[in-house]
Amino acid sequence: MQVLHVCSEMFPLLKTGGLADVIGALPAAQIADGVDARVLLPAFPDIRRGVTDAQVVSRRDTFAGHITLLFGHYNGVGIYLIDAPHLYDRPGSPYHDTNLFAYTDNVLRFALLGWVGAEMASGLDPFWRPDVVHVHDWHAGLAPAYLAARGRPAKSVFTVHNLAYQGMFYAHHMNDIQLPWSFFNIHGLEFNGQISFLKAGLYYADHITAVSPTYAREITEPQFAYGMEGLLQQRHREGRLSGVLNGVDEKIWSPETDLLLASRYTRDTLEDKAENKSQLQIAMGLKVDDKVPLFAVVSRLTSQKGLDLVLEALPGLLEQGGQLALLGAGDPVLQEGFLAAAAEYPGQVGVQIGYHEAFSHRIMGGADVILVPSRFEPCGLTQLYGLKYGTLPLVRRTGGLADTVSDCSLENLADGVASGFVFEDSNAWSLLRAIRRAFVLWSRPSLWRFVQRQAMAMDFSWQVAAKSYRELYYRLK
């Protein structure tokens, strides 16, 4: 079984979000599971530099200009690169310029990614041809459409990491991307009078997966579907929509081997976590005190992530004696709000604006509770890292958060399945009640330790996801 992943980023070569973590880990897990998985990426500067053994496979003139297809390896995974400097050789973000404006030629930059993905199924590399083209998010969404236009030389799977990003472009670009105008249709890639790369993936793929079972159900409902509910309800009825939970890359995220921690630990040596907490308190300008619970946020600061709720609930958290360490960037209003809180409550609130992968490990190793109060969350990796590190997740019951965290209710504690704190409603009062439950459990150290051990024993390895995808691919053949 030969599978080509088509996507725009891959950790650690290039990362703007959780998609990169998935592509950095899933193909390697699939190879270990007996699937010949490779990855197709645009040759953005950081990616091109990272794949040092890239050799020329093919050269083509395309609707988006001349391209060179390269093939090399990274961490044991075969990587195809679309080398087109006029499209991809730009500093900074792969999606927008330094003023945060989307590049005006994104329609060509990402149509080309989908086109090359489909061409791979028609022999662009004469020595390797995928049985399944596995496409991720809107950037690669045209690949199933190009496959359909080609008579479907391979099966296709489209994975939705976040339905909110739809890849919308003006209709006149149908003239530029080498797809039949007949595809610009409600039964096709047309959405609200525009081309939607996301809808192309959803409509033309043989199967759609979402990154958690709950998110797969949620996206058939209007409040989560951004207008795609009709199509997604139809795919659900046809048995062509399912959820496969993301995993954790244990080579990178494991408190036992994590060299970024001051003190490594296991579920049997949890007392060694205390050193990480005091180091984190020092680094964040917090009062060093192992008796108070340290709550943490590692997140984009947006209302999707529910960070406005954290700001609203913060006085209540601090009144009970808690501390907050926050790492993130995003909405300027939220940034200002958290910086003001840090100034108002020195020693209790520490804020670092920005994102540093290494520091996120130190927070995960040192905090007691990780807050993930998202309004929607397709899968969420942060809470999985929290479980792995015995940093109990406090989450809203939505998407992947609902699938991965069990509340510390009395019955869950009795059944030995409790692993964190879960609240229902997207408001500060509901969040504060969950924070209150965290304080109650914190006052029972032996019970807290019991829940930490439960959390750390859970298996969210990529091997589980790799097996689910393999079974799906064979069903499609």
UniProtKB/Swiss-Prot annotation:
Superkingdom of source: Bacteria
One matching Pfam family: Glyco_transf_5
Catalyzed chemical reaction(s): [(1->4)-alpha-D-glucosyl](n) + ADP-alpha-D-glucose = [(1->4)-alpha-D-glucosyl](n+1) + ADP + H(+)
Keywords: Glycogen biosynthesis, Glycosyltransferase, Transferase
Entry's Gene Ontology molecular function annotations: alpha-1,4-glucan glucosyltransferase (ADP-glucose donor) activity; alpha-1,4-glucan glucosyltransferase (UDP-glucose donor) activity
Stored NCBIfam families: glgA, PRK00654.1-2
Protein family: Belongs to the glycosyltransferase 1 family. Bacterial/plant glycogen synthase subfamily.
The protein's name: Glycogen synthase
Encoding gene, per UniProt annotation: glgA
